[in-house]
Each structure stands twice: as C-alpha cells, then as structure tokens.
A protein has these predicted regions:
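Amphipathic, small/basic residue-rich leader segments at the start of a protein or domain
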Residues: 1-114
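Alpha-helical structural signal
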Residues: 64, 77, 120-121, 133
C-alpha cells in the first residue's frame, strides 16, 4: 500500500455507505512484498503443479500430499500465521493473493490447501491456546 494511508471500505460497507474512489483498494496498492509472494506462488504452481495437472485431477493423493509438504516448506501454508507461531505473519492481503493463485491452478490441490489453511490452521491460530499455537 502507498505511504498515504487510505480509509479503506471494509467488507460490505460499500452497500450502506458512500465511498470515495480514492478509498477503494486495487491491485495497484499491493506492496512489493505482496507482489513477490504472489510471484513465488505462481512460479511454484508453474513448476510443481501444472506439469502434473492430470495426476492431481485423477486423485493422486500422494502427489497432493507431497506438493502440500513442498508448499509448507516454502511457507505458503503459513502466510497468515503470526511469526511467533512459525508462520510468515503477512496479513490478509498476502493470504488472499496466495489463495487466489493456488485456487486457480487445480481443483483438488486448492481444496487440500483451503482445508489445511482455512479449516485446520486458522481456527487453531484464532482460538487455540498458547500450547496449541
């Protein structure tokens, strides 16, 4: 985001309140770090996923498991996890970019990714005790 803070409209606020065009978040507002993360995930998808697309779609679970481990080793499974818990602590926008890039690749992998990060990891981060985190 630029050095000038915007009063970004959150969630569905645009439905109930007037919004100036300057306060709309757009891709031009992505930071260099966020764009680098998106590119890293895109490169990973091109190298590790797309050449094996048919195997993923034919339910090669071992390939999905191995690919998820590689994604984890690269930090893609912990983008939203705070650094003190071993994640990258990059926030919502970076998380959205990673999810968007992975979800556009192969359905079965994006389902595994979404289940791991959304159903598995985030509830522990948000609601787990210190030991669980």
């Amino acid at each position: 985001m630029s050095t000038n803070e915007k009063n970004i409209t959150r969630g569905g606020e645009f439905i109930i309140k007037e919004t100036d065009c300057e306060n709309i978040f757009s891709p031009e507002d992505f930071s260099e770090e966020q764009l680098m993360m998106k590119q890293a995930v895109s490169d990973f998808i091109d190298k590790e996923v797309m050449p094996h697309r048919e195997r993923f779609e034919n339910k090669d679970y071992k390939l999905t498991e191995d690919t998820m481990k590689k994604a984890g080793d690269l930090g893609f499974l912990g983008v939203a996890v705070p650094e003190e818990y071993g994640g990258m602590g990059m926030g919502f926008v970076s998380t959205m970019l990673v999810c968007e890039t992975i979800s556009g690749a192969v359905g079965s992998l994006s389902t595994a990714f979404g289940a791991h990060t959304g159903i598995g990891t985030m509830p522990i981060v948000l609601y787990g005790n210190q030991e669980q985190n």
